[in-house]
Amino acid sequence: MRSIISAFILSLNFCTQPLVRGAPSAADWQELQKAVEGRLFTAEPLARPCFSTFQGKSVEPNVEECSTTKQHYLNSTFKTAAYAGFVHSYNEACASNVTDQCLLSADTFSTNGKNTSGTAPLTGPCNLGMLSEKYIAVSRAEDVQAAFRFAHRTGMPLSVKATGHDYAARSSLKGSLALWTRQLNDIAFNPSFTPVGGSSSPIAAMTVGGGANLGEVYKFADRHNVTFIGGSSGTVAAAGGYSLLGGHGTLTPTYGMGADRMLEATIVTPDGELRIANAHMNSDLFWALRGAGSATFGVVLNATFKVEPVMPLTLALMSFNSTGANTGPFLSLLMKHTNIWAEEGWGGPMSMSTLALVNPAMSVDAAKQSMKEVADYVSAQGGTVVLESLPSFYAFYTKYVEAASSTGTGAATFATFRTLPKRLHQSEEGRAAMTKTFRDIKAAGHDTFIFQTTPNKFPYEPGSNAVHPSWRDSYWLVGTSISWSSNDAGLEERMRVAAAVQEVSKNLTDLAPEGSMYPNEADPWTRNWAKEFWGEENYARLVQVKRKYDPHGLIGCWKCVGFEDKLMETESAFRCLGAFQKKR
């Protein structure tokens, strides 16, 4: 069966390029500017005001703008408020060309949000990197339709950026016209929503603009006395990124993934049509959007999600100082209790010396019993144990998550995370294999992060969306993150980091070949990425949907549906990351 599917995919000969290719003329740009009513802009890097040269030409630094950028350079809210701002610098800089970037080094920006000294212009390279030269600040469907007409007529490729909280450089593309959707941030609550064309009983739902971030969505939901189920990073676009590639968080075990909770989407497809996609209309597109929809099948203007009532949560928060010898027993305890905790509805992150799990259906007294053995161990290590009741998810988010999720974005951090099948927890051999893999990762100098955020208790209908099936047969999503030491990192260091990320990916794949890489937090150099992100059967179906709605390949991104590995060598836009791809 596998070989048949693989042969079928190869035989599709998918067209990834527009009908015509060539540089748009001045008249083309003028016509586009008129069509989008002045919302076409010329881009420059966020740090450009600090430099005296840009793209090899002398420019005037702007001391005031430079000071503001330096002051907030580590703040993801500040960065994602601008087209040129990205949480991870390889989205705006060409990773494999250390001169094709315009970044601030650690000795020039503030690490505490205070003003920095020095007004002299910086002397390093300042070039466009991965940024588009032109972008449209999208505010309506007609802007997107105009962009698709422009792309079809001129051959200019398109890219889509919502907030730019992106681990795989999917929201930027050198040489493209960018569609920046951050201004599509309207949010509405409907206590009795019914999908267009449907006849099901109305349910409470929120309609979220493609550029609205999770922090904004959580605040809005709390004001309307409901709970929006999402992740931990407030600057991630709820409808424009998080849910389109799956979406997991602390409440996922009980309430499902972001893709599971989407009821309807409004999208402009590359043929210029404004479409409603749900279970009753354009159902093939709706299936694909929920799990594989990032900058692939069109531009999502908004999406509607089921919401839950406000609910009290019980938090179990534990940590201790690692001595090396005391992490093994702690990991064994996590493995021992994982299946029980999954049935009880606990969800959240863990590591070799920490635990932060949330439960929407358990009292503090019951939690004390559930967590007793682990809490006793942590206390014996001189650690901290907190068991606390919180009145709502928003109370938990604002107290424990919000501040931490908006910092630490100065350089380049690469992630690699994989689902681990339940079978590994169900035998001594499986638990020993996990322990060895985690130790190998630690020996290589990297920390292992464990997310008990798979949808174990959610009543999923098999095959109802494009999320990889392994999520339904896993307790844990496991991986690590590895960063360059600074934005000044040389090519040799960048190559070492890329190799290290790929080595951890190999370790995790060897441990659990039937698992999957999570597309939102995947190794950018994932091999066999179509299978790893979605599974071969899903991918064959996804390519058919792509061909139907985007037959000329007007829109695309790094290792999204329709991407071909040969583009890493033939297209300069993809060589920035492709140069680090290991060949095995």
Curated annotation (Swiss-Prot):
Stored Gene3D superfamilies: 3.30.465.10
Coiled-coil intervals: none
Induction: Expressed exclusively during fungal penetration of host leaves, the time point at which plant defense reactions are triggered.
A Pfam family: BBE
Name of the gene: OXR2
Domain of life: Eukaryota
Record lineage: Eukaryota, Fungi, Dikarya, Ascomycota, Pezizomycotina
Protein name per the record: FAD-linked oxidoreductase OXR2
Domain FAD-binding PCMH-type: from-to ranges: 128-310
Gene source species: Pyricularia oryzae (strain 70-15 / ATCC MYA-4617 / FGSC 8958) (Rice blast fungus)
Sugar-bearing residue positions: 75, 97, 115, 225, 302, 321, 507
Enzyme Commission designation: 1.-.-.-
Keyword Oxidoreductase appears in the UniProt entry: yes
Pathway(s) per entry: Secondary metabolite biosynthesis
Gene Ontology molecular-function annotations: FAD binding; oxidoreductase activity
